[in-house]
Amino acid sequence: MDTLIRIKRCALANRLRLTNKARDELEIDDLDITDIRESLMNAVAIYKTIRSTNPQSHRREYLHIIQSHNFSGITIYTKGKLLVEEGIDTFYLLVSSKRAL
């Protein structure tokens, strides 16, 4: 299944989680989780996928960067990863969420 569709399904089902960094960025930019959900639902493509190594587990992971606008027209930058448990997309963890420059 397409990764963007999997991310959109997590957003639609309100299965989004934020790191402290992402939460702080939202607060600084005066955004909330609804803005992020709207932005993810409006996305037409994943801008970039980055291969990374988790510092805690030392396992490879993929971070997806998406830039899209919310329903108010604000362009939002998000970076996150799909977390899968037992073959099921559990939720989308947002590592970074802020207004795009």
Regions found by a protein language model. Give the residues of each.
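Ribonuclease/tRNase effector modules and their secretory precursors
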Residues: 1-101
